[in-house]
Design a protein with these regions (language model features):
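N-terminal Rossmann-like NAD(P) cofactor-binding subdomain of oxidoreductases
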Residues: 1-167, 185
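Generic secondary-structure signature for well-ordered alpha-helical cores
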Residues: 125-129, 170, 178-185, 212-213, ...
């Protein structure tokens, strides 16, 4: 409290940013948009106290799931503001750009779901794949697990090692299933296994799909290339090109 943000992140020391203060002392009249990047369960507390004219953009899981019972099931936390769930929107910008105006709460997707839904949502909408048999092998750097990762692993156990974790029970399964089911309008089956690999950051998701009819790999590639051509942050590699993080 009272220090500049640059004290913790030297990379932004030249930026003019306010000093860190307690949320109780914030003058809400000077704020239009509020970002929260806090542990699960904290953003919903803030959502209850901020004025309704402030847009909350949350990076946690507090408003990702439409059903508070599912949130309790997957995250083990009773939701403190169930009514605000209905006023929130789960938003991957590439798919919900036109729905973001006049929103109260924008919920950002998880890291794995982002990498998985960017290619899958267009294909599910176009009915190009069998949604009852989607296999996802995803690998992530250890920074995605936050500070707690260092309590479970030391450098020696991370180095030259690949570990599968939360097999069949990863929390991100809930939002992947929720969003793909909305689009397909029927029950889907996703087999998702995340892995921790010895690098600091980055995600590589390899997705195995069963296509319908004459939808070859080349046809799917061409469709995704066309679909994302105006999405600035999506870069489509050349067909059959080796890719990595």
């Amino acid at each position: 409290i009272g220090k500049n943000i640059s004290f913790f992140d030297k990379g932004i020391k030249k930026k003019f940013l306010p000093k860190i203060s307690k949320i109780k002392k914030i003058n809400w009249n000077k704020i239009n948009v509020l970002f929260t990047a806090l542990p699960n369960g904290e953003a919903q507390k803030i959502a209850k106290i901020i004025p309704p004219y402030i847009l909350l953009i949350d990076l946690s899981a507090d408003f990702r799931l439409n059903d508070h019972k599912l949130y309790k099931k997957w995250y083990g936390i009773n939701h403190k503001c169930k009514k605000l769930i209905k006023k929130s929107i789960y938003a991957i910008t590439e798919f919900s750009r036109n729905k973001l105006n006049n929103q109260n709460i924008i919920s950002c997707p998880g890291c794995y779901p982002t990498s998985i839904q960017l290619p899958l949502i267009p294909l599910v909408r176009k009915k190009m794949i069998n949604t009852s048999n989607i296999v996802i092998d995803a690998k992530s750097g250890y920074s995605g697990a936050g500070k707690n990762i260092h309590k479970k692993f030391n450098f020696k156990s991370l180095f030259n090692s690949v570990s599968a974790y939360n097999v069949g029970s990863h929390r991100h399964m809930a939002e992947i299933d929720q969003e793909l089911t909305k689009i397909s309008k029927k029950k889907i089956n996703v087999f998702f296994t995340p892995h921790l690999i010895p690098m600091f950051r980055g995600i590589l998701s390899t997705i195995y799909l069963e296509t319908y009819g004459k939808n070859s790999a080349k046809k799917i590639y061409n469709y995704l290339k066309k679909y994302h051509k105006n999405n600035f942050f999506i870069k489509i590699a050349k067909f059959n090109t080796s890719i990595g993080t």
